[in-house]
């Protein structure tokens, strides 16, 4: 059994709503399900990627996880800001932010005349929470977010029990 799983380094940040769609997060979640301490790491860049800072961050976080462990069913989501002059601002423990996608579907036709739909869209950043993952990387900080596998909305359970199923 491995001592640690590091998923990534992913090209592009995994913040806000994107956590739900991320293969990088999913791979770390699988490790967590197997009882292996796991880290998902992403670089906030899609072009001109320089992974040198991300490699240093990954080694530091990995060492800390090996030395300190993680709670059961918990993984770390680490996002590294794109290379900025002067280096990173530091590390910030964050929570999942409110960045989401506004999806659009474009009707297209392939070379054989078959219709298909292409999903496109844009990122909507409504996040102003200074402790969120997206705000941290915009300010040059490495975002470290503890994620848990348990996604039940416990606050809603009692109300849901009153529904007439």
PLM region spans:
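Short glycine-rich anion-binding loops that position phosphate/pyrophosphate groups of nucleotides
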Residues: 10-13, 149
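Glycine/threonine-rich flexible loop motifs
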Residues: 13-22
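Hydrophobic/aromatic ligand-binding patch that stacks against planar heteroaromatic rings
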Residues: 27-32
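Short, glycine-/small-residue-rich phosphate/pyrophosphate-handling segment
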Residues: 39-68
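C-terminal accessory domains and tails appended to enzymatic cores
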Residues: 67, 71, 81-165
């Amino acid at each position: 059994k491995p001592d640690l799983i590091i998923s990534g380094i992913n090209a592009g940040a995994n913040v806000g709503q994107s956590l739900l769609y991320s293969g990088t997060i999913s791979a770390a979640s699988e490790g967590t399900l197997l009882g292996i301490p796991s880290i998902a790491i992403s670089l906030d860049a899609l072009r001109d990627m320089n992974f040198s800072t991300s490699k240093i961050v990954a080694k530091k976080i990995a060492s800390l996880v090996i030395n300190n462990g993680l709670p059961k069913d918990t993984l770390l989501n680490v996002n590294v800001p794109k290379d900025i002059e002067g280096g990173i601002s530091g590390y910030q423990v964050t929570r999942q932010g409110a960045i989401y996608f506004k999806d659009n579907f474009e009707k297209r036709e392939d070379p054989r005349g078959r219709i298909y739909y292409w999903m496109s869209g844009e990122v909507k950043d409504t996040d102003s929470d200074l402790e969120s993952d997206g705000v941290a990387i915009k300010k040059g900080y490495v975002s470290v977010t503890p994620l848990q596998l348990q996604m039940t909305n416990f606050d809603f359970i009692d109300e849901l029990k009153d529904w007439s199923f």
